[in-house]
Amino acid sequence: MDRAQKQELVTTLTDVFKSTSVVVVAHYSGLTVAQLSRLRRQMKASGATVKVAKNRLAKIALEGSDVAHVSSLLKGPTLIAYSSDPVAAPKVAVDFAKTNDKFVILGGAMGTTALNVDGVKALATLPSLDELRAKLVGLIQAPATKIAQVTTAPAAKLARVFGAYAKQDEAA
């Protein structure tokens, strides 16, 4: 990499660290290209991104950002996963780590909060933003559905009573 490419990478990473809501740092030593490609595809499918950058360049990009404390984790072959959804990157990383022993989560950050391995795993157990929105819509719609059922129930009961009387009259 020449100097211009390094500056461009640092600028890109700086923008990422300032705009992202969650960052996960992990060791990937020993993973095959196919496994790393699968991780990238899974991250992309969930709305997250994986970057492998030189630790020194990543540390420069982290300076002055909310997640600057993550720089202490950048030792050895590390990758950085990030997403705007606070649950997407941790969830994919934890699921991937369960199936690949060589993928080791070191920690991360959410906003200005530093996360250890347990913190990243705890984030992974939370429902995603889309799941929370769906639950909220369901909770909002539930009272309206109940009201509709309550208002139509007497009419339905009355119709069944009339139907029973009609059958009784036909039988007689």
Swiss-Prot record:
GO terms for cellular component: large ribosomal subunit. Pfam families: Ribosomal_L10. GO terms for molecular function: large ribosomal subunit rRNA binding; structural constituent of ribosome. PROSITE patterns: RIBOSOMAL_L10. InterPro entries: Ribosomal_uL10 (IPR001790), Ribosomal_uL10-like_sf (IPR043141), Ribosomal_uL10_bac (IPR022973), Ribosomal_uL10_bac_type (IPR047865), Ribosomal_uL10_CS_bac (IPR002363). Keywords: Ribonucleoprotein, Ribosomal protein, RNA-binding, rRNA-binding. The keyword Nucleotide-binding does not apply. One of its GO terms (biological process) is translation. It comes from the Bacteria. Belongs to the universal ribosomal protein uL10 family. Part of the ribosomal stalk of the 50S ribosomal subunit. The N-terminus interacts with L11 and the large rRNA to form the base of the stalk. The C-terminus forms an elongated spine to which L12 dimers bind in a sequential fashion forming a multimeric L10(L12)X complex. Forms part of the ribosomal stalk, playing a central role in the interaction of the ribosome with GTP-bound translation factors. This is Large ribosomal subunit protein uL10. It comes from Xanthobacter autotrophicus (strain ATCC BAA-1158 / Py2).
